[in-house]
Every structure is written in C-alpha cells, then in structure tokens.
Swiss-Prot record:
This is Myosin regulatory light chain 2, smooth muscle major isoform. One of its GO terms (biological process) is myofibril assembly. Residues 1-20 are annotated as: Disordered. Residues 1-16 have a biased composition (Basic residues).
Length: 172
C-alpha cells in the first residue's frame, strides 16, 4: 500500500487552488474574455499553459523569446497554470501592483522606436489581424476617445493612463 502512495507522489505537480474566490472578482463577460485569452495561449489544448505554449504564442506574433525570458514569465506562477490560476494571476495584477506597466509594455512590443507612439494605421492592422481580432467598428470605438495626434500617432502611454484612471476633464 505504501508503494502506491509513493508512486502517486511522483506524478505531475497539481495546480494550487486559489485562496480566494477569483471568479467573484470579474463579471461573466470578463471571465469569458479571459477564457478566450487562456485558450489562445494554451496552444496544445491540454488545459495548462506551459513554456512551450508561451513560446508558440509569442512566435505566432513574430517574436522570438529566449528561454530565459520564458522561464521568467513561468516563474510568476507558483505551480502549473490552469485557467483558475491564470485568472488568479490576472486578478492579482489588475487589483494589486501597477497594471499600467503591463498594458504599456503590451503596446511597447509594437513600438520599434520606443517613442510611446504607434501609428494608428499600423495599430489597426495589428488589432484586426492578430490574436483575438477586433472588428473595424471596435477599433473605431477605441479610437473615438484615444489620444491620436494630427500625424495619426496613437499615444499608448496616455491611452494606458486613461484606461487606468479615466480621461482628464476638459476644464483641467
């Protein structure tokens, strides 16, 4: 009997349970969006995000991440990343430390000059052709209140601030 117990302990490490009800932190539509994002990253469809899934997802976006970079991303999780752990990690990021960095860094991946701007046409192309694709109408909606200068440059640093803190009043 004890040999069976010893054998069971050598199997794959099980994901840790979330300590709080992470599903109560988000509404149904947000949870659905997170599920779609999780499924996009879980390239091999095994219900867990691993280093290979991250590599394949980033490669599909034209990136060539180093092993060290991927290890750094994976080390943020205390164990295997199933959907509940994924949601917990996002909940901690959104409600804890500064999520502005995360949002800004997502845009910065496509800002080759590190200027804080992405041309609106290029961003529209990215949003409508990659990942969870936006429709042209959704991009138009996003651009309606977005900080875009006369040359068509989308200021993602300011946009990130607006997302997190709201737009400044016109009177300011």
């Amino acid at each position: 009997m004890s040999s069976k117990r010893a054998k069971a302990k050598t199997t794959k490490k099980r994901p840790q349970r979330a300590t709080s009800n992470v599903f109560a932190m988000f509404d149904q539509s947000q949870i659905q969006e997170f599920k779609e994002a999780f499924n996009m990253i879980d390239q091999n469809r095994d219900g867990f995000i691993d280093k290979e899934d991250l590599h394949d997802m980033l490669a599909s976006m034209g990136k060539n991440p180093t092993d060290e970079y991927l290890e750094g991303m994976m080390s943020e999780a205390p164990g295997p990343i199933n959907f509940t752990m994924f949601l917990t990690m996002f909940g901690e990021k959104l409600n804890g430390t500064d999520p502005e960095d995360v949002i800004r860094n997502a845009f910065a991946c496509f800002d080759e000059e590190a200027s804080g701007f992405i041309h609106e046409d290029h961003l529209r192309e990215l949003l409508t052709t990659m990942g969870d694709r936006f429709t042209d109408e959704e991009v138009d909606e996003m651009y309606r209140e977005a900080p875009i200068d006369k040359k068509g440059n989308f200021n993602y640093v300011e946009f990130t601030r607006i997302l997190k803190h709201g737009a400044k009043d016109k009177d300011d």
